[in-house]
Amino acid sequence: MVPLRPLALGDIVTGSFSTLRLHWKRMAGVALLVQAVLLLAMGLVAAASVAAVFPHLEPVFDAPYGEAPTREHVMPLLVAAAVLFVALAVLGMLGMAVISAACLAVLKEAVSGGPTTFAAVRRVAFRRAPAMAGAMFLGYLIAGLPVLAVVAVWAPLAVATASEAAPGALLVPLVLGMLAAFPVAVWLSVRFGLAPAAVVMEDAGPVAALRRSTALVRGDWWRVFGITLVGALLAGAIGYAIQLPFNLIGSFVIVPAIALAEDGVSAAGAITVLVVAVLVTLAGGIAGQLFQIGFMQLVAGLLYTDQRIRREGLAEALLAGHAVPPAAPATAPEPPQQQDAPQDGR
């Protein structure tokens, strides 16, 4: 499936599609399991957040006409919203880490020629998920530092000069700063782009995986960037194509819901149709997102494999590991031993 030689762009794209085609059941099984757990956990977190601030909802969103909500009701809602955002972001990153680890675990066995079972993929995915999430978080954080630095410098200046400068003039420094920070952020993201593969392929920790990715990308940044860009474009286009039928079906299903509401039919029927439309659209979004995550991780994993083949002779090591040991040399049968004949008189 994956040739053990330096890989060209076509080899990487073809290998990614081949891995998806041959092992999609295992990857989809882990992904659906993760999505089910995530939806349940996110629902519980959201319900707990709403329950915690429920007494403050009516004073803020249904305040008497002409009266502004008081601080004692607004602040708990802001705190709950911030906590909910962080909790959902953490859960989302953990889910993406498990799915990414599952895809790379399948690729690892495909490259090395080992068996890939659902149980084995699930074990590796959940075992490496914390390290994967750590590597992803550190990579995103470091890559986003240039953009955060621009915003941190621009925001106080914008507040200090808001009353004096024209609104359009305040955006000029921000745009210029972003134009300078964006290339640096892209350079850093490509530099750390092979870290997830190192987490699964080498059982590396988050920091070690970032260092490993830096070492493998060094000197080949433009090649890694180009192949990653092609993979991202393919993943985005195919992911959108997967979502489109679901979105169209969801849009068509919403029309009867509107008609039911206008005809004065019971609200339960309209709500049921609306829920079906939302679920169909949500299913399409999840399917498209899972494809994009899986395909991009396979592209990154094959790039990692290619860099190791080119730099470290990984192909020779894998071939040596799968070589059949030579058979033992055949030995000639020993001649039968002759027994001494009994002598007379003895």
Predicted features along the sequence, with ranges:
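Juxtamembrane transition segments at transmembrane-helix termini in multipass membrane proteins
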Residues: 59, 188, 192-202, 230-346
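Membrane-helix interface segments in multi-pass membrane proteins
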Residues: 42-89, 147-182, 243-289
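N-terminal membrane-targeting/anchoring modules of bacterial envelope and secretion proteins
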Residues: 1-96, 100-126, 140
